[in-house]
Every structure is written in C-alpha cells, then in structure tokens.
Amino acid sequence: MSWISPELIEILLTILKAVVILLVVVTCGAFMSFGERRLLGLFQNRYGPNRVGWGGSLQLVADMIKMFFKEDWIPKFSDRVIFTLAPMIAFTSLLLAFAIVPVSPGWVVADLNIGILFFLMMAGLAVYAVLFAGWSSNNKYSLLGAMRASAQTLSYEVFLGLSLMGVVAQAGSFNMTDIVNSQAHVWNVIPQFFGFITFAIAGVAVCHRHPFDQPEAEQELADGYHIEYSGMKFGLFFVGEYIGIVTISALMVTLFFGGWQGPLLPPFIWFALKTAFFMMMFILIRASLPRPRYDRVMSFGWKICLPLTLINLLVTAAVILWQAQ
C-alpha cells in the first residue's frame, strides 16, 4: 500500500515501544504494592495478604476492583477542579519521568539530549500536584502535609540534581544513553560513590518514602495531603508513588550501575534485575528504619547532603581538569 511509508512505520514502532515500556512501568508499580505487603509481613513475622487467590496472588486484582467501585467522593468545600487535577498531575509527571530511561539498546521512550534535566523538571512538576491536593481539599491536615511535602521535595531535589552533576561531568552529556555507554569499563558508582549515596537518600525523600514520609505520617497528619481522596483519585496517588520508586530505582541503575550492561544475559534482563534489587531496598528500608522528626530531616539535608554533594562535585571537576592536562 502506497500510504505506508518507512517514516510512518518508524513512528508506529516508536509509539508501540512507548506504550509497552510505560505499561510495564505501571504494572511494576502496581505489583510492587502487593510485593511490599507480603515482604513486610515476612519481615514482621506475620503472613500478609494471602486470602485472595493462591498465596494471595490475586490480592492486587481484588484491590483494583474495590478501588474502582468505591465512591469517588469530593469534599463539599473543596476546589473541585484543582482537587480533581492534582492526582492526574502526580500520576502523569511521575510516569513521564521514566520516559528518558533506556531499558536496553534502542528501547527508550524519549532519547533526549537533556534527559537528566527532563527528569528533574518532571520531579518538580509533581510538587505542584501535592500543593494542589493539600490546598484544594480545604482540610488542615491535608494542608500541613502538603506544606511539609513541598518543602521536603524542593529541598531534596536540590541535592538530587547536584548529585548527578558529577556523572554529567564525567560522561560529558545529559543524555541517558550516552551516560550508560560511558560506563562500559567502570560503573559510575565507583568514582561517584558519594554522589550515589546522596542520590539514593534524596530519591527516597523525593518519593516521600519511609523514613522520609513525614508528609503522610499517619500518627501526626492522618495520611497527609491525600486524606480527603478516595476511589480512583486516591488510586492515582497510590500507584503514582510506586511508579516514582520504580523510576528512581531505574535511574540508580542507569546513572551509577551501568544500565543494561552485563555479561551473558540479555540487556533487558540485566536492567530488570538491577532495578528489582533497588526496589527491594526501598522495601527493606521501610521495614527497618524509624521515622525521624521533620526538623531533623530538613537539617540532615541542608547540613550533610548539600556539603557532601558540593564536595563530590568539586573533587570530580578537579580530577577531570587534572586528567586533561
């Protein structure tokens, strides 16, 4: 057929790749919620969800059906438009942040030359969703949770971005594929160890995960900025949080652990195994660490993480200049 051109086929293949990758990310985020509950039960010497299906294997399906049929309630005195937009912005921004991650050679949704900057932009956009949710709910606990979340996220995004500048300086590019290719001989985690530590800490904080989950602290704020959400709106926030974990784990692999590179196994398998390891670390951290006070979280970021990232960046720049001479 004359209307089928090579350009059209290329566009269709690109769309197909994007749909497949993003569907896999959403599925991984959903299944991680079930896996986390089972593993937390194991860590805490209890069973966890094991009633629906064999060994609880259909628990996720039951939760999805329950959430889909729950009443989608909107508070009487809330700002209905902003209240509805907030979970959509949160889910979309966190999902789009994964678009620049190459899962194997040639398999990336958007191979941008400003890949890292695009990720930081999407992470910053998620802050607006939190503020919208807290403000539009017209609830004091929701507003306090949103203020905590926005201050914490904006603070730790500074350290998140600075921790990546050493990687960018070594690779000479913001493109994620170029960064993976630059690790053919040595993974960035070795020369950029302190950058990796800071990125991991800031990544946990940006995802609002334990022990940095003060914006959602049940004992203090009754679930924080999404206290008034129910049904599918709450589901978008809930799944979006786990998509954020998948994205941060994938970025750790891509930026510091060679991405898809590895012996014997296919590239995608290596990428999936490395990412699954860091997703498991998120769950282990939640099971083992206590929640510190909010002021100590902020103090830790500005007094320890910020100097560490600046020292790492200065040392990296000095080494690059010394090698160039």
UniProtKB/Swiss-Prot annotation:
GO terms for molecular function: NADH dehydrogenase activity; oxidoreductase activity, acting on NAD(P)H, quinone or similar compound as acceptor; quinone binding. One of its GO terms (biological process) is aerobic respiration. One of its GO terms (cellular component) is plasma membrane. It is found in: Cell inner membrane. InterPro entries: NADH_UbQ_OxRdtase_su1/FPO, NADH_UbQ_OxRdtase_su1_CS. It catalyses: a quinone + NADH + 5 H(+)(in) = a quinol + NAD(+) + 4 H(+)(out). Keywords: Cell inner membrane, Cell membrane, Membrane, NAD, Quinone, Translocase, Transmembrane, Transmembrane helix, Ubiquinone. The keyword Cell inner membrane applies. Belongs to the complex I subunit 1 family. NDH-1 is composed of 13 different subunits. Subunits NuoA, H, J, K, L, M, N constitute the membrane sector of the complex. This is NADH-quinone oxidoreductase subunit H. It comes from Shigella flexneri. The lineage of its organism: Bacteria, Pseudomonadati, Pseudomonadota, Gammaproteobacteria, Enterobacterales. The gene is nuoH.
